[in-house]
């Protein structure tokens, strides 16, 4: 499902940003 893929990408970006310390 396209929506799920978009949500997954946002979640992944959020996780990466969190690990780097941006968020």
Swiss-Prot record:
Subcellular localization: Secreted
Chief location of this protein within or outside the cell: secreted
Keywords: Secreted
Cell wall biogenesis/degradation keyword on record: no
Tissue expression summary: Expressed in skin glands.
One GO cellular component, as annotated: extracellular region
The keyword Secreted appears for this protein: yes
Coiled-coil annotated spans: none
Role played: May act as an antimicrobial peptide.
The family this protein is said to belong to: Belongs to the Frog skin active peptide (FSAP) family. Septenin subfamily.
Protein name: Septenin 2b
Organism annotation: Osteopilus septentrionalis (Cuban treefrog)
